[in-house]
Design a protein with these regions (language model features):
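The feature marks the mature, well-folded catalytic cores of soluble enzymes
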Residues: 2-11, 17-288
């Protein structure tokens, strides 16, 4: 059986003052994941499976009802990082039964799981005018960081408040942060394959120096065409048009004429791996 331990939280180059972190330690075993976790908790991913899933699996992941055919991907459901995050969050309530517990965002994008946490009196940080109101958090409160992680500024705020951090950030996400940090130290611009408003991408961008976020191949093709002066598909975008298109998806002071000379690629882990690889290949062919 695993147990929860209170340990210093790594700073990940954010400058945090080592707030406390509730983590899991297992008694042994192996896993193909970066961090093996075995926890006995109230969370069971099987609860979220339905009869329709069973039917699809029994019929080669495809079934037809009337004139509608439904196909199921062979890799589906909660990934191990999600299982891990929810298990740690559930265990946190057991570890701190009388403490006030907050969470900075939805633990995962699943209404049933999030409702269960609300029933366990895990409260959302309130948002006003698009800004999180961390003033509701008091010294000594417990704050859960979700599977997607949290931005550097949020971690610094919580560190200064001397709260107890329950860090459920997926290890695959922290690997991306480490890559982005290397880009920053090497004075590379990070091209992030993701959605600029997604919590994970917001967190990843906060670890970057210069960055631009592209959602798909169309957007990265636009970027490459700008770099090549319209030679790729003839769009011949102006600097003004470029900045208008990516006004919510670039770092402060971003200059496409200067900041796209040397770049590295990172991704939001929920994006398609194959598309990220295609984006990286296109950039390497057109930029160098």
């Amino acid at each position: 059986m695993a147990s929860l331990q209170v340990t210093p939280l790594p700073t990940r180059s954010s400058g945090c003052k080592n707030p406390l972190s509730v983590r899991c330690s297992s008694g042994g075993g192996s896993s193909s994941s970066p961090s093996s976790v075995s926890i006995h908790s109230d969370f069971d991913g099987k609860v979220f499976r339905r009869d329709i899933i069973k039917t699809l699996k029994e019929n080669n992941y495809e079934y037809t009802w009337g004139n509608v055919t439904v196909k199921l991907a062979e890799a589906y459901g909660f990934c191990w990082g999600v299982d891990r995050a929810v298990q740690i969050a559930y265990e946190a309530r057991k570890q701190f039964p009388g403490d006030k517990i907050w969470i900075t965002n939805e633990i995962i994008h699943n209404p049933t799981v999030n409702k269960r946490l609300q029933e366990m009196e895990v409260k959302d940080i309130p948002i006003q005018d698009g800004e999180k109101q961390f003033d509701v958090v008091d010294k000594g409160d417990v704050v859960i960081l979700p599977a997607f992680g949290a931005a550097v500024s949020e971690m610094l705020t919580l560190s200064n408040k001397q709260v107890q951090i329950v860090d459920t950030t997926c290890p695959w996400v922290t690997k991306v942060w480490n890559i982005v940090d290397k880009h920053k130290k090497g004075d590379y611009t990070t091209i992030i394959h993701g959605k600029y408003s997604h919590e994970e991408t917001i967190a990843t961008a906060s670890f970057a120096g210069k960055y631009i976020i592209v959602k798909n191949m169309d957007e990265v093709t636009y970027v490459c065409d700008y770099i090549l002066g319209g030679k790729l598909n003839g769009s011949n975008s102006t600097k003004e048009a470029f900045m208008e298109k990516f006004k919510f998806a670039v770092s402060k002071g971003f200059d496409p004429d200067k900041d796209l000379v040397k770049a590295g690629v990172a991704n939001q882990t929920t994006m398609l791996k194959g598309e990220t690889e295609e984006i990286g290949m296109l950039l390497s062919l057109k930029m160098y």
